[in-house]
């Protein structure tokens, strides 16, 4: 896992660039992708109430960091947020340790 010193940004920073509506859409879409089964044990209300930082914590506590990055890339692409999916893909987005 990359440290924050090695990356100019992390998944939390990317999620914080989303508007409240976009973040809600991200939360909804994350469960629809094939990798979304990793989150099935997390109560929907917990995901719905989470802000960007809390969502990253949920991802990393219920799955591996590779999954979190891949899931984020897929959801950003579904949302037509290609600038975010490209940055995530290019830098292997992970939260700081």
UniProtKB/Swiss-Prot annotation:
Its tissue distribution reads: Predominantly expressed in peripheral blood. Weakly expressed in testis.
Q: Which domain of life is it from?
A: Eukaryota
CDD domains found in the cross-reference section: Pyrin_NALPs
The alphabetical list of record keywords is: Cytoplasm, Immunity, Inflammatory response, Innate immunity, Nucleus, Signal transduction inhibitor
Domain Pyrin, chain residue ranges per copy? 1-94
Q: Which GO terms describe its biological process?
A: inflammatory response; innate immune response; negative regulation of inflammatory response; negative regulation of interleukin-1 beta production; negative regulation of NF-kappaB transcription factor activity; negative regulation of NLRP3 inflammasome complex assembly; negative regulation of non-canonical NF-kappaB signal transduction; negative regulation of tumor necrosis factor-mediated signaling pathway
Cellular component (GO) terms are: cytoplasm; cytosol; nucleolus; nucleoplasm; nucleus
What SMART domains would the database entry show?
PYRIN (SM01289)
- InterPro entries in the cross-refs: DAPIN, DEATH-like_dom_sf
Q: Subcellular location, in the record's words?
A: Cytoplasm; Nucleus
Q: Looking at the keywords, is Nucleus present?
A: yes
Record flagged with keyword Nucleus: yes
User: Quaternary form?
Assistant: Interacts with PYCARD/ASC (via pyrin domain). Interacts with NLRP2 (via pyrin domain).
General function of this protein: May play a role in innate immunity by disrupting the interaction between PYCARD and NLRP3, thereby regulating the NLRP3 inflammasome. May also inhibit NF-kappa-B signaling distally by affecting the nuclear accumulation of RELA.
Q: What is this protein called?
A: Pyrin domain-containing protein 2
Task: Identify the species of origin.
Answer: Homo sapiens (Human)
Q: Which gene encodes it?
A: PYDC2
């Amino acid at each position: 896992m990359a440290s924050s010193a090695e990356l100019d940004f992390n998944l939390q920073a990317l999620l914080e660039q989303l508007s409240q509506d976009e973040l809600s859409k991200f939360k909804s879409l994350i469960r629809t992708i094939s990798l979304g089964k990793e989150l099935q044990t997390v109560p929907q209300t917990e995901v719905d109430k989470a802000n960007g930082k809390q969502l990253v914590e949920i991802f990393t506590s219920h799955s591996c960091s590779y999954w979190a990055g891949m899931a984020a890339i897929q959801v950003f692409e579904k949302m037509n947020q290609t600038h975010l999916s490209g940055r995530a893909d290019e830098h292997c987005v992970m939260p700081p340790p």
